[in-house]
């Protein structure tokens, strides 16, 4: 099946079934960033239905490019498998089923790009588990970091969002430490941060 047809089908499925995927306003930036860094080894937390993995796959290093993607939800994991199996990238994408906080403790590989797009309140905890496996100069992308304008805006978040907003603020404070990362935050969609890791000895 042609990749564009699969992506269109995924967009429709996501809209009908209320599955969070990259917003249209973010897709161009996302593809530009992946194309710019052209990673060989990618770790994604939060596969959902495999939309972002299939956006990344054709932009990776042609010979060695590989994506490892983690998803907790049973239905989304199966849908991601279904869509990826229809594509030409089945050999380039490995899906792992489970809670990322557990799966990440079992990592053995090294990654030059990480995409955080799972539970927003877990970003910092997950990054701390991932960093020992990130190559110096590796890139960490995190989606939804501005969370409806509450994280860096003047708006007071509703009570139900206060914990997630506080944790995203803590995440941004961490990745904006200039001794550890060079970080840029893009306002598209719900905000995406791009952090270049300076290495373990900094």
Can you name each region flagged by the protein language model?
Residues 1-113, 120-141, 145-202:
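A short alpha-helical cap/connector motif
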């Amino acid at each position: 099946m042609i990749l564009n047809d699969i992506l269109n089908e995924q967009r429709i499925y996501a809209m009908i079934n209320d599955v969070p995927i990259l917003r249209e306003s973010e897709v161009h930036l996302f593809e530009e960033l992946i194309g710019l860094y052209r990673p060989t080894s990618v770790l994604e937390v939060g596969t959902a239905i495999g939309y972002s993995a299939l956006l990344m796959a054709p932009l990776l290093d042609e010979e060695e490019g590989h994506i490892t993607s983690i998803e907790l939800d049973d239905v989304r994991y199966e849908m991601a498998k279904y869509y990826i199996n229809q594509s030409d990238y089945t050999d380039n994408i490995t899906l792992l089923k489970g809670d990322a906080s557990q799966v990440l403790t079992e990592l053995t590989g090294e990654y030059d790009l990480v995409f955080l797009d799972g539970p927003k309140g877990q970003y910092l905890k997950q990054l701390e588990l991932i960093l020992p496996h990130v190559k110096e100069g590796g890139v960490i992308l995190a989606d939804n970091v501005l969370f409806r304008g509450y994280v860096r805006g003047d708006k007071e978040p509703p009570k139900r969002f206060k914990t997630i907003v506080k944790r995203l603020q803590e995440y941004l404070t961490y990745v904006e430490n200039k001794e550890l990362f060079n970080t840029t935050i893009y306002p598209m969609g719900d905000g995406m941060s791009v952090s270049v890791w300076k290495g373990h000895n900094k």
